[in-house]
Amino acid sequence: MRTLTETKACVVRKPFLGVIADDYTGATDIASMLVRGGVATIQTIGIPSQSLCDSMKADAVVIALKSRALPAADAVAQSLAALSCLRNLGVRQIYFKYCSTFDSTPAGNIGQVGDALCAALEVSTLIHIPALPVNGRSVYQGHLFVGTTLLHQSGMENHPLNPMTDANLVRWLGRQTRRTVGLIGTSVITKGRADIDTEIAAFTAGGGGHLIGDTVQDSDLELWAQVLQSAPLVAGSSGLATPLARRYMAAHQMPAEMAERKAKIPPQTVRNGHTLILSGSCSSATLAQIETFRTTGAHCIQLDPLRLSAEPALLDEVLESTVTGLKNAPVLVYASDSLHKVQAAQNALGAVAAGKLVEQAFVTLAQAAARLPQTGQLIVAGGETSGAVVAALGIAALRIGPEIAPGVPWTEALDAQGALVLSLALKSGNFGGDGFFSQAIELAGRA
């Protein structure tokens, strides 16, 4: 098996773990989970520059790509570039991070990226742990559940980019790879590590491929961390990150108080201004969060793609209202809406055109408002929106701070030279409770 380290690392302190994440909010999710386990973590936006590499001192480095909805060949190319960077940093383990709802299509690209990473690292069998029990994602008999609902009945079947129409992950992943896809089910998990190791060894002896691991509770994650702590390559959601981090801390005899200190580093860039919230997610969780925030009497502005298309001056009005509103209170600007209204806009404008119109509006708002003195910090909800905003602001990396909700921390946004930009929270659409926005603002006020 090929070693992970190719050349001398460009950091004084070598990270033990390198994560390749397929979108920005997903990267922040796993970075937060690593910090929860006591591991100092840096998240980069795309492949980091040499100067940024030189400034990084961390136990884990998360490279955030925007590859989730890309054609498989493009996603593979980006992922292999990230792998090369992480190997140069000297990491001992690679973690391919995707969403806990396994966001993909029959055309890819989880299977193809996994195959490419296996080939590059000469790994015969890739274990997938997609579950995230703390957020209600579990895998039983190879089927992914959101709460008590099968994935394809949870609303994810209506996802505009990656509609998930089959909860059977063995079958779904099998459509994305020519390699064998198998399952280590609950009946094996309950017997313990020895039986799991035996199943993996037998599968590998038969030619290897991909194995989906059942996981229904946190104790299952602890067991999987024990099994996979020395694996050169693992794949899944962020669920496995915290127990892996804790095992690293224990193995290196890191004092408990040091782990606790690392896990609660507050962002240092919180300013006196108010919080700007930009939401492009149309998930049911985000829609509930918006409605809850609206009921507090907060300043909320909705972006309607049909009106944006018909009224070019509308965006200037929204910007003026946002900038003025931030002088007195937090402001939420959202394009999030019901499936019916989203589809109506897509039918009228075209799905791609509607998405780009909204994305550009958020970019304009972020560029104009993010560095104003009345803007204290920024929250962005939705993976695609987060990617667009982060790129527009020239953010190259995130130093992970305190957790707002599982998988969503406050962070310090850094530029390509490692200089501080502002405090930022990137929220995956389905994460957080109904009161998320108010909780985030309250935490920022305490930091």
Identify the meaning behind each predicted range.
Residues 10-57, 77-81, 129-134:
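N-terminal basic/disordered segments at the start of proteins
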Residues 14-16, 40, 59, 72-75, ...:
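Cap/lid and interdomain-hinge subdomains that line or gate substrate/regulatory clefts
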Residues 19, 42-44, 94-98, 126-130, ...:
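General beta-strand structural signal in soluble alpha/beta enzymes
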Residues 30-32, 106-110, 137-145, 195-196, ...:
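Short acidic, glycine/serine/threonine-rich loops at helix termini
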Residues 58-67, 326-328, 412-447:
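A structural-propensity feature for long, helix-poor, extended segments
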Residues 147-322, 327:
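Conserved, well-structured core segments that form the ligand-binding/active-site neighborhood
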Residues 322-383:
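C-terminal structural cap/anchor segments
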Residues 375-436:
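Conserved, well-ordered active-site substructure
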